[in-house]
Curated annotation (Swiss-Prot):
This is Small ribosomal subunit protein mS23. GO terms for biological process: translation. It comes from the Eukaryota. PANTHER family: MITOCHONDRIAL RIBOSOMAL PROTEIN S23, SMALL RIBOSOMAL SUBUNIT PROTEIN MS23. Component of the mitochondrial ribosome small subunit (28S) which comprises a 12S rRNA and about 30 distinct proteins. The lineage of its organism: Eukaryota, Metazoa, Ecdysozoa, Nematoda, Chromadorea. Pfam families: MRP-S23. It comes from Caenorhabditis elegans. The gene is mrps-23. Transmembrane segments: none annotated. GO terms for molecular function: structural constituent of ribosome. The keyword Chloroplast does not apply. Its main location: mitochondrion.
Length: 133
């Protein structure tokens, strides 16, 4: 019955599909699902509409990038980490130390550009003994 219809091209709700299978003889009346009799005896007040377009259907999906995510991506692009990140470790990772230091530098130098802040953070971490490779 529905071999030519994919799930993306739905042929109707599940009730109409099961009803079609029963009428076509593909599903025995005795083998019908438990919910079928309940649905027949008390159908929904409004018919189910499976082809509803939501309010924001045509709007593109917004990119959500937090400042920390962009900074972490730039850090890993500049310094490719060869060491594994241990999730259960109590020590903060080098990238997290970089981000924390970046926030401190940014609070001290509010007028600096992102590239200048990145370079100042590199210098400050090198002065503190954290080697960035």
């Amino acid at each position: 019955m529905a071999s030519f219809i994919t799930r993306a091209e739905r042929s109707g709700n599940i009730f109409s599909r099961v009803t079609g299978l029963i009428r076509a003889g593909q599903l025995n009346w005795a083998d019908r699902p438990l919910w079928y009799d309940v649905y027949v005896s008390s159908p929904p007040l409004t018919p189910p509409d499976w082809n509803v377009k939501l309010a924001k259907y045509d709007e593109p999906i917004r990119s959500i990038f937090y400042e920390e995510d962009v900074l972490r991506a730039k850090f890993y692009k500049t310094y490719r980490s060869t060491a594994g990140i241990q999730v259960d470790s109590s020590r903060t990772s080098v990238s997290q130390q970089f981000i924390n230091e970046y926030k401190l530098v940014k609070s001290e130098n509010a007028e600096a550009t992102d590239d200048q802040l990145f370079e100042m953070t590199q210098k400050r971490l090198n002065e503190n003994g954290i080697v960035l490779k």
